[in-house]
Curated annotation (Swiss-Prot):
Subcellular location: Secreted; Vacuole
Protein name in the entry: Peroxidase 34
Biological process per Gene Ontology, one example term: unidimensional cell growth
Record-linked Pfam families: peroxidase
Amino acid sequence: MHFSSSSTSSTWTILITLGCLMLHASLSAAQLTPTFYDRSCPNVTNIVRETIVNELRSDPRIAASILRLHFHDCFVNGCDASILLDNTTSFRTEKDAFGNANSARGFPVIDRMKAAVERACPRTVSCADMLTIAAQQSVTLAGGPSWRVPLGRRDSLQAFLELANANLPAPFFTLPQLKASFRNVGLDRPSDLVALSGGHTFGKNQCQFILDRLYNFSNTGLPDPTLNTTYLQTLRGLCPLNGNRSALVDFDLRTPTVFDNKYYVNLKERKGLIQSDQELFSSPNATDTIPLVRAYADGTQTFFNAFVEAMNRMGNITPTTGTQGQIRLNCRVVNSNSLLHDVVDIVDFVSSM
């Protein structure tokens, strides 16, 4: 759409007039709250939950996949739904980052979820908040804890491929590298790292990310010595050296679709699937993580409590709030004519205060 000079002038007049209100709104919105949509979209959690329930009937992996999307979103410029954006002429998608390419999944489900939310509450719920709710609901539906997530985020105006490559933890990370990765985004407690790693209690991973552990760890020509020998043989059967590198393996062979504490039981038995998992218990630097692994393995509720706290801390990494960003209508693309959309968003936001 073409804007005349008078149209553009009017738009800027609106923005200037709202200047003081915008500042007040931005300051007021800095604190996320579970009640953010209680009046404007009270059924958003039910809509999100129903979408996931329907998808689980045909795709038991989707709960773990959605949780992973949220994690990978929050580690890159905060939880701003930047991971959901497709390529444009202005930026490259985070979907092409090393930690996401050919492994991040669930985007069509997010599309259907957003369409359902928009039908119920037009221009109200951000993709960032919707993905946060979806992650929580995915955990709960898989047998994990239930909690109300703090809300009030807005969506980014771009993706951050380079930042994704720099920030996302890799499956071959050592414990010092893992700690540095978490610390880099403000998650500096050992419990943040150990509890959030428990997200690997369900879901699957590709053989290509564990082949070195199984056959040529650190270029030694030998397997990772921290691997349980029986588990090693099981994994070699699932991932032959010259087999399908994209073949999938359960993170937790005990209860692969259930969100429970068996991940930590596995670590104690040296049955962590990827190196970065087993590092929490087997690294020489694990003096502050081993006690947490033991505690979570011994007590499901202890793990659940720590996981909820860590999820909320991760969800609060540099949130985009107030009049920053926008509320995308389609999670894959920045709103067209975003200036006018943002003006409407500001008016709606201020009027709701």
